[in-house]
Curated annotation (Swiss-Prot):
Name of the gene encoding the protein in the UniProt record: SNHG12
Protein name: Putative uncharacterized protein SNHG12
Species name: Homo sapiens (Human)
Amino acid sequence: MQGTWLPPSFLAVCDTEEVSLFLELCFKIHVTCKAVLICDYGPMELGQSLWEAEGKDPGHFR
């Protein structure tokens, strides 16, 4: 079950291809990126590939 406590805008972003943009913002404003994994957009591997595509360190997911 995904975190229903997250703001609707958060879930909306996770349901679109703009998730990479959210990850970039997440990285910049130091949001608890662990919450990103709660979104039902794919497995951890997808998250890591998105970070790598953006030139980010997948370690931030932990």
